[in-house]
């Protein structure tokens, strides 16, 4: 009888362990994925990644809020934790800039801006084995599933010249800027007036 009970307990524990293993999230799921044709696969679940910052881009020629867009920046959790420990971005870092339309509501005292429909995402990837310049940039509309790397002049040059840490705009990420300064990886020179126009 004891043997049967022990066997039943062992089977129960084995089944539980197997189910936990299956349901556990893949710790490497935030790494970049590519097709066989070297296109980047659209990152899924990025809204559960680490949120870094938002910006509202306003068109000076627009009126009544037209042409304004929000940008929300997310970074892969594994890269974020490595940055907090070292002040630098590890290989296979992934950033997502989510672009959304803006809706404005005015009152006598304030003008409020709200995020609305998804326009698309821009993805920044550090992959030293795949890209000669280490970082590459990809553009997705609201439904695109894969994308080729953008031309060098489209994104890389601005990021390389204006990024405070490697090719990234850490100067605009208030939770990371002090860490980069502490580790000595922060390029203070990028904080000139030109950097604010990026």
Residue ranges, per PLM feature:
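Generic detector of low-complexity/intrinsically disordered segments
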Residues: 8-9, 22, 42
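Secretory pathway targeting signatures of secreted, lumenal, and periplasmic proteins
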Residues: 50-74
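N-terminal post-signal-peptidase region of extra-cytosolic proteins
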Residues: 69-85, 107-109
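Bacterial N-terminal signal peptides
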Residues: 7-17
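N-terminal low-complexity, intrinsically disordered patches enriched in charged
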Residues: 17, 80-81, 101
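Positively charged n-region of N-terminal signal peptides that target proteins for export
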Residues: 1-5
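Sequence context surrounding c-type heme c attachment/ligation sites in exported
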Residues: 26-35, 40-50, 54-59, 86-198
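Signal peptide processing junction and immediate N-terminal pro/mature segment
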Residues: 18-26
